[in-house]
């Protein structure tokens, strides 16, 4: 009996501190998109186009953000975004399992202190054709405007978006896993 409690204690002690950002299963597209929404620069007059879909790679489902990002008409983004409520400050960044068309992509975080829709914090990462893990630390996120607070904590986060942004290109970002760590 003591061995059982000791084993449980060890498992709890050595468990990683993480939070899955894909609360809804990727295997159920309809349910998943009740939490995550596709948004483009069309909301502000831009001409980028794209979509977010759920696909399957062998045995694993993943989210794909794809489309044509255009900087015409002051645009230049497509994204998939979800509101989040994070109750712990014990996180230091976001870890993703990604692949896609080789390019730079972004994580956009909005906090409860950002009131205007063009305000966010951006964390940059690169993808390749092969699946890989990337970690983007909160301390490496850049604020979009000079008048924003310089830093944020996990409990300040209001939404998380995965974004193809800032240049004219054909985007294809695949995300199999997304978690706070």
Predicted regions and their residues:
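Hydrophobic h-region of N-terminal signal peptides that target proteins for export
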Residues: 9-17
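Beta-rich carbohydrate-recognition modules and glycan-binding surfaces
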Residues: 16-181
């Amino acid at each position: 009996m003591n061995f059982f409690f000791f084993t449980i204690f060890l498992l709890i002690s050595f468990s990683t501190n993480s939070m899955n950002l894909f609360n809804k299963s990727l295997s159920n597209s309809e349910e998943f998109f009740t939490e995550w929404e596709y948004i483009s620069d069309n909301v502000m007059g831009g001409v980028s186009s794209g979509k977010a879909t759920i696909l399957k790679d062998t045995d694993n489902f993943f989210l794909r953000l794809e489309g044509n990002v255009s900087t015409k008409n002051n645009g230049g983004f497509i994204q998939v975004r979800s509101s989040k409520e994070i109750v712990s400050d014990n996180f230091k960044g976001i870890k993703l399992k990604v692949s896609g068309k080789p390019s730079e992509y972004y994580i956009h975080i909005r906090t409860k202190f950002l009131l205007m829709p063009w305000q966010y914090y951006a964390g940059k990462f690169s993808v390749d054709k092969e699946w890989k893990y990337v970690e983007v630390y909160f301390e490496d996120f850049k604020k979009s405007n000079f008048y924003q607070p310089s830093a944020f904590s996990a409990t300040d986060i209001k939404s998380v978006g995965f974004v193809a942004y800032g240049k004219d290109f054909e985007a294809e970002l695949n995300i199999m896993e997304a978690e706070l760590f």
